[in-house]
Amino acid sequence: MIEHIDSLNDARLDVFMRLTEVQLRNKLEPEKGVFIAESDKVISRALNAGYEPLSLLIPNHKLALMQSLIERINAINPAIPVFVAPAQEIKNLTGYELTRGILCAFRRKPLVSVKKLLMGAKRVAVLENITNHTNIGALFRSAAALNVDAIILNQGCCDPLYRRAIRVSMGTVFRVSWTRVGEDPRAVKVDDILAENSEETSPDKERQKLSSYAYQGDALRWPHEALVRLKELGFTTAALALNDNSVALDDPRLKACEKLALLFGTEGEGLSYQTLEECDYVVKIPMAHGVDSLNVAAASAVTFWELCR
């Protein structure tokens, strides 16, 4: 449903600029969360992945070019608003020129448990405390291209559905299934609530009831419970890091693993000591000219090429 906007003060446009990424994500109620996708190609990939469109924003001079996409969204629900406004007015609203022609707000999907995510998976990436959205987007793009079945992020990682991460990934964040593990320090603590209500309810039932509010994804504690779960599901764990016990990336034992989980750490300090201690292998990428490390996005691409084909 096309609506020409007379005033950018319209509250329905808040989702495109006036709400922060954190407000869009709505961590305590992820079923109400929203993300923004840019460009017809990325929006089409989100639609292909089954995400629910909520509204679109298009500069008036791009309206004709986006007609086929608008028709596709109208077929999903003709009541979905397509807001149209002059390009300069949209720039004033968003703070930048809409060079990719279109923005679309989508409803987030609930995240699933690790067990459900990894049904049928053979090669997975596990990310710890990676906070750079460009790196997250690039890593997802490499994972999609190089046959990674799923990605697990701990709560210290940034959001794969952050606008920049989606843009860098070219929408491949919608093609690789993912979830989060670990307690979110910014969310309600289940154990604290249980302590307050210990005499009134069964802890197991109360934990199950509250977990969807306190955690986004799987409430397995990071790293111990998450890595134990991976091993219970048959995965060998291999951490990318440089230490005295590292094996080379082309070690035949790694390729021989039926199920392999590849762990990557934060851009600066890498994986934590506890995480390294709990992994089956520590793996290094052989390098020349005295270079001792690669950017995590580059390292993941090299690793996926070697072990996920």
Feature-to-residue mapping (PLM):
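A glycine-rich helix N-cap at a beta->alpha junction
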Residues: 78-86
